[in-house]
Amino acid sequence: MKKLIILLLLINISVAYGQSSLRLGVNIDPITSWLSPKTNRIDKDGARPGISGGLMVEYYFHENYGIVTGFNLGVQGGNILYNDTVKISTGENTSVWVPAGASVAYNLSYVTIPIGLKLKTNEIGYFTYFAQLGFAPQINIGSRATSSGNGLNKDNVPKEINLLNMSYFFGGGVEYNIGGQTSLLAGIFFNNGFVDVLSNNTHKAVQNFLTLKLGVLF
């Protein structure tokens, strides 16, 4: 039964792709990310570079409008300055006390499955211009923390980070047709988080990031 369902899904994708209503692609996206505090117990202490990559799926219900989704694996994060002494869990029975005034750098790994709307122009020369907006649900699959001189050096801190994250995104860019249905893509996107990333109830922060999206659509 499972094999039959998979076969039917593949047939549906093939038919849709043959009708040019479905486009698939791959992307790799440099990221600049930061954690924005929502309490006065912590302060932002700088951004961190990151990277994301994966698959793009676009389904068009009109020549100029479509639904976009995909699957991405990426690393983002940010630096936080704690204004009071904080206990950071590094395992089942281990923890590190970080003193007030210390900065902690978080590197966070996520699986992202975005869903949004894409609006695009007709092709002008070889160029097509587009805008996108939507939501980006994320699942945390890894979290590390570093604080120089305070006992944290890329330690795993899964208990400090919430499993689920959510942001809305908007941005735009350009596609360059290199032949047939194949296009190079470049765009700039901003994600604004609205779910607390930190599991500690007294320290709240959301994840924001700026993305340079680079990809190929087929």
Language-model regions: role of each:
Residues 20, 47-51, 107-111, 127, ...:
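Residues that define the transmembrane beta-barrel architecture of outer-membrane proteins
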Residues 1-4, 19:
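Positively charged n-region of N-terminal signal peptides that target proteins for export
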Residues 26-30, 51-59, 71-73, 113-119, ...:
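Residues on the lipid-exposed face of transmembrane beta-strands in outer-membrane beta-barrel proteins
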Residues 35-44, 77-109, 141-162, 198-203:
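Flexible, solvent-exposed loop segments that connect beta-strands
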Residues 17-56, 217:
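Short glycine/proline- and aromatic-enriched beta-strand/turn motifs that initiate or cap beta-hairpins
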Residues 76-82, 159, 165-218:
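Predominantly the C-terminal beta-signal and adjacent terminal strand-loop region
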Residues 19, 62, 122-126, 177-181:
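Outer-membrane beta-barrel channels and translocator barrels
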Residues 4-13:
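Sec-dependent N-terminal signal peptides
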